[in-house]
Amino acid sequence: IYDRLVGSEMCIRDSLSKEPLAAAVRDNDDDWKDVVEWVWFGMVTAEEMSITSDNYATADTSVPAVDRLLNSNLGLGTEANPLPDTWMQSVLSSVGNYGEAYDNSFCDGTYDGHSGSAAMTGCVLDRAGTDNALVSEGGLQFAPPMR
């Protein structure tokens, strides 16, 4: 079951079972669940669009899909405490898109955020060719339209 030893930590195979898992949040807090889900969707969408922590501020917002990603509240948050329209810009500036966050967690942190899973190096958990890759790369990671 163990794939490799990294320092004093054991890394198990990246696929122990095939089941759709998602971020877990407490019951009875649909507003928070929506925020967590859409942060994930936004990170995946940003990587699909090659929008990274380095280039989000100069992304072409004349493209409607890019503008929705970077400048739309999407009705998230609560009536008393809605998210700002630039919430996804805050996510990107903090952790980057999905590929950047994956690389910083499981690889050497040098991924450019848009060249695809195969460009990631020094990974303790490879993403290329696994369920963790984007759908466009044969993986399972996708996001609905940012609407």
Question: Residue locations for each model-derived region?
Answer:
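Single conserved hydrophobic/aromatic residue that forms the stacking wall/gate
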Residues: 1-12
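Short, flexible coil/turn micro-motifs enriched in small/turn-prone residues
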Residues: 2, 133-134
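Functionally constrained cores in energy, signaling, and assembly domains
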Residues: 2-3, 23, 105
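Extended ligand-binding regions for polar small-molecule ligands
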Residues: 13-88, 97, 113, 130, ...
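C-terminal capping/gating helix-and-loop segments adjacent to ligand/active sites or protein-protein/ligand interfaces
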Residues: 93-123
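Low-complexity, intrinsically disordered Gly/Pro/Thr-rich segments
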Residues: 123-129
